[in-house]
A protein has these predicted regions:
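Short, low-complexity N-terminal intrinsically disordered segments enriched in polar/charged residues
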Residues: 28-79, 191-194
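Bacterial N-terminal signal peptides that target proteins for export
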Residues: 1-13, 22
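Hydrophobic pocket/interface hotspot
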Residues: 60, 77, 85, 139, ...
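C-terminal segment of classical bacterial N-terminal signal peptides
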Residues: 17-27
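Short beta-strand edge/turn micro-motifs at domain boundaries
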Residues: 156-185
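Sec/Tat-exported extracytoplasmic proteins
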Residues: 60-68, 81-85, 89, 112-116
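Surface-exposed, charged secondary-structure patches
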Residues: 86-87, 91, 96-149
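Short, surface-exposed coil-to-beta transition loops
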Residues: 122-125, 153-160
Length: 194
């Protein structure tokens, strides 16, 4: 879910969320009530977007990707996520401490929309590993982020998708991501051919 640059969005989200009184996971109260957005009605999904785990992941990448100035279809994004879903970025601060910045889908839209439109952003999956049990699937999706569709990636990393099949459709429960950096290069097993 790298944007403008994954680092810029992660830093922006971290700062904006701190200003919005959202805190890293370690500082959150587990007994806190669910946010209002978790009870809002979810827009109807396109059947093709939620027909398989592959389809729902492709739909997420598709909805966040687009050229500079292009509005994103945020209702399509909302339709992919289970109510109460979370998007979480692992961010390394200037002090070297890694924290998890937790966002609702609405937080992500509010923070990401201006950045995605300002610079253009394309993210695609380069490789995937998957674990499955019953109706749940955990996917490590190696991503490549670009400002233009055919440009060299400016960022790579892992999007960790947790998915649920409810018997009728697939839902995204969580996306948890971290960008590659010099301290954490992507292992070969998460690269094409790995």
């Amino acid at each position: 879910m790298g944007h403008v640059s994954l680092r810029k969005l992660t830093a922006f989200c971290a700062l904006a969320l701190a200003g919005a009184s959202l805190q890293p996971v370690a500082a959150q109260n587990a007994a806190a009530p669910a946010p209002a957005s978790s009870t809002a009605a979810t827009p109807a999904a396109r059947p093709a977007d939620v027909a398989s785990e592959d389809a729902v992941i492709k739909a997420v990448y598709d909805v966040i990707s687009g050229p500079k100035g292009q509005p994103r279809d945020w209702d399509r994004m909302r339709s992919l996520f289970v109510p109460g879903a979370r998007l979480i970025s692992a961010h390394t601060g200037d002090d070297g401490i890694v924290t998890a910045h937790v966002m609702t889908v609405e937080d992500y839209i509010r923070l990401g929309d201006p950045l995605l439109k300002k610079d253009g952003f394309f993210e695609r999956e380069a490789h995937r590993t998957e674990d499955r049990f019953g109706n749940i699937v955990q996917v490590f999706s190696t991503y490549e982020s670009r400002h233009e569709a055919d440009a060299k990636p400016f960022q790579r990393g892992i999007n960790s998708f947790q998915l649920l099949f409810d018997g009728k459709r697939w839902w995204v429960v969580t996306i948890y991501w971290q960008g590659e950096d010099s301290a954490n290069p992507l292992p070969a097993k998460y690269l094409p051919g790995g």
